[in-house]
Amino acid sequence: MDDLFKKIQQLIAAKLEIDEDKVTLDSSFRQDLGADSLDTYELVYALEEDMGIKIPDEKANEFETVRDAYEFIKSQQK
């Protein structure tokens, strides 16, 4: 696991009040992690603040798994 994933994993676990080990790249926000639409909105906002990036709403709506968010954030940090 790289540092970026670890940061994302910690943030998601804290926001959803779950164990970090439940957050994997292939975890579905809704099915595996139990996030509802409000949780997802709050996660996107927290990721934007923490990572110093802007995630367009249309892109955020495409985030189904942690990998989706990770890959987008990684692409913005180059």
From Swiss-Prot:
Modified-residue entries (O-(pantetheine 4'-phosphoryl)serine), positions: S37
Pathway: Lipid metabolism; fatty acid biosynthesis
Keyword Nucleotide-binding: no
Pfam families per the UniProt record, alphabetical: PP-binding
Gene Ontology biological process terms from the UniProt entry: lipid A biosynthetic process
Keywords of the record: Cytoplasm, Fatty acid biosynthesis, Fatty acid metabolism, Lipid biosynthesis, Lipid metabolism, Phosphopantetheine, Phosphoprotein
GO cellular component term, pick one: membrane
Domain Carrier: 2-77
Subcellular location: Cytoplasm
Post-translational modification: 4'-phosphopantetheine is transferred from CoA to a specific serine of apo-ACP by AcpS. This modification is essential for activity because fatty acids are bound in thioester linkage to the sulfhydryl of the prosthetic group.
GO molecular function: acyl binding; acyl carrier activity
Job of this protein: Carrier of the growing fatty acid chain in fatty acid biosynthesis.
NCBIfam families: acyl_carrier, PRK00982.1-2, PRK00982.1-4
Family note: Belongs to the acyl carrier protein (ACP) family.
HAMAP family: Acyl_carrier
Protein name as it appears in the record: Acyl carrier protein
Organism: Treponema denticola (strain ATCC 35405 / DSM 14222 / CIP 103919 / JCM 8153 / KCTC 15104)
Gene this protein is translated from: acpP
